UniProtKB/Swiss-Prot annotation:
This is DNA polymerase sliding clamp 2. CDD domains: PCNA. The keyword DNA-binding applies. InterPro entries: DNA_clamp_sf, Pr_cel_nuc_antig, Pr_cel_nuc_antig_CS, Pr_cel_nuc_antig_N. GO terms for biological process: leading strand elongation; regulation of DNA replication. The keyword DNA repair does not apply. Coiled coil: none annotated. Pfam families: PCNA_N. Sliding clamp subunit that acts as a moving platform for DNA processing. Responsible for tethering the catalytic subunit of DNA polymerase and other proteins to DNA during high-speed replication. HAMAP family: DNApol_clamp_arch. Homotrimer. The subunits circularize to form a toroid; DNA passes through its center. Replication factor C (RFC) is required to load the toroid on the DNA. Keywords: DNA replication, DNA-binding.
Length: 245
């Protein structure tokens, strides 16, 4: 197995984001592309990421491969990746090789862990409200909310508008996003309102680097679904369980 990633920096943020929730991950290289799933220890956040085969500059695979890795080790390898770097992933016996080809060539070998089967929850939800937003807009808003000091974020849909609010030590911050003010790219559905953990939501925003747009879907006392759209039809889905009022 050997794959080549031209946008090594963007791809690295998949691992950086995953490590916010889990310590180990099973990487699945299949005929259609790269997949990884995970659930945080508290079972609040379920993650489902797919990067299609066409995303990769090269994708050489004889058989489907499942490779367990320590995300701490992977992030140590890729922490200094630059936008000029090209990344190669290659499996050699019981090692996975990370090669970064940029200003100079560096190769790292990491031990392969036994792959774990992630308990996949049954997700068959009809979300009353959906909206699309630029990931840069969403990320900037969450950065501001983090400074307020609250631990929960309220998502409220009303008359096609989306309101995000956080109550913290500095008071309450409310942001209105709509088609009219340019905060939303698309908006559809009915009124809904629910509360989620701010840290769980904020930790997803590292995906703003490889993703341009984000779909937000939720309902009253339903999980929040955040879909970061990736190139070539890929996606990074985060399902976050609601908090009780």
């Amino acid at each position: 197995m050997k794959v080549k990633v031209v946008d090594a920096l963007g791809f690295s943020y998949i691992f950086k984001t995953l490590s916010q929730y889990v310590s180990e991950a099973t990487l699945l290289f299949g005929n259609d592309g790269f997949k990884v799933k995970g659930m945080d220890p508290s079972k609040v956040v379920y993650i489902d990421i797919f990067v299609p085969k066409d995303y990769f500059e090269e994708y050489n695979l004889e058989n489907e491969m499942k490779i367990g890795v320590s995300l701490k080790d992977v992030n140590e390898v890729i922490k200094n990746v630059s936008k000029e770097d090209i990344l190669y992933l290659e499996l050699e016996k019981d090692k996975i090789m990370f090669t970064l080809d940029g200003e100079y060539l560096r190769t790292f070998s990491l031990p392969v862990l036994s792959p774990d089967e992630v308990e996949t929850p049954s997700i068959n939800l009809e979300f009353p409200f959906r909206a699309n937003i630029l990931t840069s807009t969403f990320g900037d808003l969450l950065d501001e909310f983090d400074q307020i000091g609250g631990d929960s974020i309220r998502f409220k849909a009303q008359n096609g508008k989306l309101y995000l609010s956080v109550m913290g030590d500095m008071g309450e911050s409310i942001v209105e996003l709509s088609l009219e003010n340019g905060g939303l790219l698309e908006s559809t559905g009915t009124d809904a309102e629910s509360l989620y953990g701010l840290e769980h939501v904020s930790n997803t925003t590292k995906m703003r680097r490889p993703s341009d747009t984000l779909e937000i879907a939720f309902g009253s006392q339903l999980p929040l679904k955040l879909r970061y759209n990736l190139p070539k039809g890929g996606y990074a889905d985060f399902y976050i369980a609601p908090r009780s009022e």
